[in-house]
Design a protein with these regions (language model features):
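Hot-dog-fold acyl-thioester-processing enzymes
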Residues: 1-58, 116-143
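Hydrophobic beta-strand-centered segment that forms part of the acyl-chain substrate-binding groove
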Residues: 40-79, 83-91, 104-111
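Preference for bulky hydrophobic residues occupying beta-strand positions
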Residues: 13, 59, 64, 94-96, ...
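HotDog/MaoC-like acyl-thioester-processing domains
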Residues: 71-72, 83-143
Length: 143
């Protein structure tokens, strides 16, 4: 498989009290999954924008690991990178870093998200029941 040309998306957010559970006050895992999905979707959008495959939906989230928790006030930086490209699917690897209030950083999470490209995001199939092929030249260039 060819190397994918530096298609990345960075998503940053701060942990607020409503993002945490009550004991101890650490971020909900569901909040982290949601933010990972947002980062991955941004990466796919950047890769497929202005193409017939411009609509994509998340179909699977795999290999998720939470290494440490996050507290109120921490800055989380999610970096999404395209790791595999199929005919109608895109795999995105997301890695999260926690930046403490004192500026120190540590890995917080990672996972893979699979997207499929669709004609209409409200109806995940085309008229003949097939998904939209991804124009690889948009992602790999013309070389």
């Amino acid at each position: 498989m060819p190397i994918i040309h530096n298609i990345q998306y960075e998503h940053k957010f701060i942990i607020f009290p409503q993002d945490t559970n009550y004991m101890p006050p650490m971020v909900f895992g569901g909040k982290m999954l949601s933010e990972m999905d947002i980062a991955a979707a941004g990466c796919v959008r950047r890769a497929c924008n202005d193409s017939p495959a411009k609509h994509a939906v998340t179909t699977r989230i795999t290999d998720v690991e939470f290494h440490v928790g996050a507290e109120v006030g921490d800055l989380i930086i999610m970096t999404a990178t395209i790791s595999k490209l199929g005919v109608t699917s895109i795999e995105v690897t997301v890695k999260g870093i926690r930046e403490h209030k004192d500026g120190k950083t540590e890995d917080i999470c990672c996972g893979k998200l699979i997207f499929v490209t669709v004609k209409d995001p409200k109806n995940h199939r085309t008229e003949n029941g097939k998904l939209i092929p991804i124009p690889h030249e948009l992602i790999f260039g013309d070389n």
